[in-house]
Amino acid sequence: MQAKAVARTVRIAPRKVRLVVDLIRGKQVGEAIAILNHTPKTASPVVEKVLKSAIANAEHNYEMDINSLVVEKVFVDEGPTLKRFRPRAMGRASQINKRTSHITVVVSEKKEG
C-alpha cells in the first residue's frame, strides 16, 4: 500500500528542489526527516512538510505503521513559470523566468525480509 502527498506550484526552481529530494529517496521516514532538518537549503522545509503530510496520510487514511514507512518515490516536476521583465540598458528589457515546482512524495511500508 502506498500513500502520497503533493505540493503544487511551490515558488522554488525544480533544479534546486531536486538537489534536496535526491538525498531522501529510498530512506526510512525518520532518517529522511533528520536529513532534511540538517540540510541548509531553501527547499528543505518545503520537502519536509510534504513528507510529513504523506506520513500523516499513510497513518490516517491507510492505517499503516509509521515506524515501517520508507520513502518509495519522490520526484519534482516543473510547474507554471511566472514571467517577469528586468529593465536593461538603452531602453531594452530582458525576460526573467521565475520557475515553480510540483513536489510529489510517495511512502510505503517496508517489505519484510
Swiss-Prot record:
Classification via CDD domains: Ribosomal_L22
InterPro entries: Ribosomal_uL22, Ribosomal_uL22_bac/chlpt-type, Ribosomal_uL22_bac/org-type, Ribosomal_uL22_CS, Ribosomal_uL22_sf
Keywords: Ribonucleoprotein, Ribosomal protein, RNA-binding, rRNA-binding
CC annotations in GO: cytosolic large ribosomal subunit
Record-level GO BP terms: translation
Recorded GO MF terms: rRNA binding; structural constituent of ribosome
Pfam families: Ribosomal_L22
Oligomer status and interactors: Part of the 50S ribosomal subunit.
Recorded family membership: Belongs to the universal ribosomal protein uL22 family.
PANTHER family documented for this protein: CHLOROPLAST 50S RIBOSOMAL PROTEIN L22-RELATED, LARGE RIBOSOMAL SUBUNIT PROTEIN UL22M
Chain's role: This protein binds specifically to 23S rRNA; its binding is stimulated by other ribosomal proteins, e.g. L4, L17, and L20. It is important during the early stages of 50S assembly. It makes multiple contacts with different domains of the 23S rRNA in the assembled 50S subunit and ribosome. The globular domain of the protein is located near the polypeptide exit tunnel on the outside of the subunit, while an extended beta-hairpin is found that lines the wall of the exit tunnel in the center of the 70S ribosome.
Protein name: Large ribosomal subunit protein uL22
Gene: rplV
